[in-house]
Regions:
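Transition segment at domain starts
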Residues: 1-28
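C-terminal edge strands of extracellular/lumenal beta-sandwich accessory domains
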Residues: 2-10, 32, 90-120
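N-terminal functional modules and adjacent low-complexity/disordered segments of proteins
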Residues: 6, 19, 52-53, 108
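Acidic, Ser/Thr/Pro-rich low-complexity intrinsically disordered segments
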Residues: 23-88, 93-97
C-alpha cells in the first residue's frame, strides 16, 4: 500500500525559508503543503544520496496522481524557482523515478524551500 505523507510547512516568524528532511521508499512519496500568494516565487533545492529525489509542484486544488503538475522537477533538475499564479496552498511532492521505485529504493532527502516576493 502506498504511503503518501502530507505535512503543512510553517516558516519561523520573520523567515521565508526552511529546510525539510524526510525519507520514503519505493512508490511512496512525501508531500508538503505551502501557502503562498499570487506572484510570489517558490525557490527550491533538493539533495539526496544518489540524486534519487525529485519534486513536482501542484497548484492549489490540484492533486498528485490526478492532475498535471505546475512544475515538473525531473525535467528541470534539483534546484529552480517558479512564479506562483494564484493565492493558496501549493503541494510540493517529493518522489523518485519509476526505475528506482521499482527496486524499492529508500531515499533520504533535504529540501530547501523559500518564498520570495516578486520584485517588479
Amino acid at each position: 500500500m502506498l504511503k503518501n505523507v502530507e505535512t503543512k510547512v510553517s516558516f519561523l516568524k520573520g523567515s521565508s525559508q526552511t529546510t525539510l528532511t524526510g525519507k520514503f521508499q519505493g512508490y511512496d512519496d512525501v508531500r508538503y503543503r505551502v501557502f503562498a500568494k499570487s506572484g510570489q516565487i517558490l525557490k527550491f533545492n533538493i539533495n539526496s544520496y544518489g540524486n534519487l529525489a525529485y519534486i513536482n509542484i501542484f497548484a492549489p486544488g490540484q492533486k498528485p496522481g490526478k492532475d498535471k503538475p505546475l512544475f515538473v522537477g525531473s525535467t528541470v533538475g534539483f534546484s529552480g524557482e517558479v512564479t506562483l499564479p494564484v493565492d493558496g496552498d501549493y503541494i510540493v511532492q517529493v518522489y523518485q523515478m519509476k526505475k528506482s521505485a521499482q527496486r524499492n529504493r529508500a531515499v533520504s532527502f533535504n529540501l530547501d524551500l523559500q518564498i520570495l516576493d516578486n520584485k517588479k
